[in-house]
Swiss-Prot record:
Name listed for the protein in its UniProt record: Telomerase-associated protein of 50 kDa
Gene designation per UniProt: TAP50
Originating species: Tetrahymena thermophila (strain SB210)
Role summary: Tethering component of the holoenzyme telomerase ribonucleoprotein (RNP) complex. Telomerase is an essential ribonucleoprotein enzyme that copies new telomeric repeats onto chromosome ends by repetitively synthesizing the short telomere-repeat sequence 5'-TTGGGG-3' using an RNA template component TER. In the telomerase holoenzyme complex, acts as a hub that anchors the two heterotrimeric subcomplexes with the catalytic core.
Keyword Transmembrane annotated: no
Top-level taxon of origin: Eukaryota
Length: 422
């Protein structure tokens, strides 16, 4: 974990304060395994949480919050730890949140949290990045590891500090970005050195807090750091650390190159295995397809045989059917001729019957006509007789009328003779 402090005086005061706190805790609680309560008095109320990422520390999630009595309470599972710092001089209000490893920070305000495993204290330094700078809004988390048997295993600082820290905000921000990039690419070392070379800019130092089991590079860097600590972190120390960091990065790069070669070979072998596996799978697939084709060919041959047999049966059936149809047609023709003869005979008989019926009908008609003629003749004679009788009566009546008129004329007076028109 990378850590950045500002000032030798602050560094010394911080170290003395931590040592005093540890001694106080150790004198008060001889059996550290039984410790369950620490108190921490702070200058301001705060709310934060933290998830421990170090395997040698608490692995459970740690949640902390300030109670009404301004006490910091840490919770790990079912166990609660309340941390208490009696010395308020080094405490200031702070903010806290999760950050990835290798975070580089600039300390301005801070507070502490403490928890332990077995005989080792984990002292966390909670740092508030400068709130007055809009471009820096991130809050970083840094830690100091302490062990009773080996003392302070790692700490770091910057050799300059200014009360006018706001004037250096842009330089601090740029230096932080460069240091972050340094962890990935050593080409920024010269740029970093040039940016820290000027006395008008704050000088930054790289630091690694070490675990109990250090590798060779960590041990060398630890000795280099101790030498720089004796030299009060002068410019020569800065150059030595930068040069050593450059060498370490080269070693890491070479190691990475070797690892890349090995990884490349492993990748090639893996790809060959995958290719071989794919080839085997392809062969199996082709074999399956060939088997399917063979089965389809057998099926097609079977279908062709069945089709030929069906065609033969159809031809035989059609031949038999044609023969049977011819016989049926001849038989039908014969039956038709026979039927025609019967029909002709029936028609002839019917004609004779009809002829007889017509003759009888004609006779009846003639008889009826004769009867009607006779009847009409009788009626006509009767009518003539009646007419003659009527005419005779009318003539007689006329004669009578004429007679009467003559009689009347004969007996009229003489004076009426002048009016006669006869």
């Amino acid at each position: 974990m990378k850590l950045l402090l500002q000032n030798q005086n602050i560094f010394q005061k911080l170290k003395n304060t931590l040592n005093g706190c540890i001694k106080k805790f150790y004198d008060t609680y001889q059996d550290l395994e039984q410790m369950q309560k620490f108190e921490m008095i702070v200058e301001d109320k705060l709310l934060f949480r933290y998830s421990c990422s170090q395997s040698e520390m608490f692995s459970a999630q740690i949640q902390a919050h300030y109670l009404e009595k301004r006490v910091l309470q840490l919770t790990d599972g079912n166990v609660k730890y309340i941390v208490n710092f009696r010395d308020k001089g080094v405490l200031d209000k702070a903010n806290f949140f999760d950050t990835p490893n290798n975070s580089l920070v600039i300390i301005r305000q801070w507070s502490y949290e403490i928890y332990y495993t077995k005989n080792t204290f984990q002292i966390n330094l909670v740092i508030d990045e400068m709130r007055c700078i809009d471009i820096i809004t991130t809050i970083f988390y840094c830690k100091l590891e302490l062990d009773f048997t080996q003392g302070i295993k790692g700490i770091s600082k910057s050799s300059s500090f200014s009360n006018q820290i706001y004037e250096y905000s842009a330089q601090y921000y740029k230096a932080i970005q460069l240091l972050k990039k340094l962890l990935i690419n050593d080409s920024y070392i010269s740029e970093l050195y040039n940016s820290t070379k000027s006395k008008q800019q704050p000088r930054l130092f790289i630091f690694q807090s070490f675990k109990p089991k250090m590798n060779l590079a960590e041990q060398n860097l630890s000795r280099q750091f101790e030498q720089c600590q004796q030299d009060d972190f002068g410019d020569g120390c800065l150059l030595q650390i930068v040069n050593y960091t450059h060498q370490s990065l080269k070693q890491i790069e070479n190691k990475n190159n070797s690892n890349q070669i090995v990884n490349g070979q492993n990748e090639i072998s893996k790809k060959k295995r995958v290719l071989k596996s794919n080839e085997d799978l392809y062969k199996i697939s082709l074999q399956k397809q060939l088997k399917i084709f063979q089965e389809e060919e057998i099926e097609l041959h079977s279908q062709s045989t069945i089709r030929n047999q069906t065609n033969q049966q159809l031809e035989t059936f059609e031949s038999d059917t044609s023969k049977r149809n011819s016989e049926k047609i001849l038989h039908s023709i014969n039956e038709l001729n026979t039927s025609k003869q019967k029909v002709n005979q029936m028609n002839s008989s019917q004609h004779q019957i009809q002829k007889l019926e017509n003759n009888n009908l004609n006779k009846n008609i003639l008889n009826q006509i004769n009867e009607n003629d006779i009847k009409n003749e009788l009626e006509e004679r009767q009518q003539q007789h009646l007419t003659q009788s009527f005419n005779s009566k009318a003539q007689l009546k006329k004669i009578i009328t004429l007679k009467k008129n003559q009689d009347i004329l004969l007996f009229k007076p003489q004076e009426q003779e002048g009016s006669k028109k006869y």
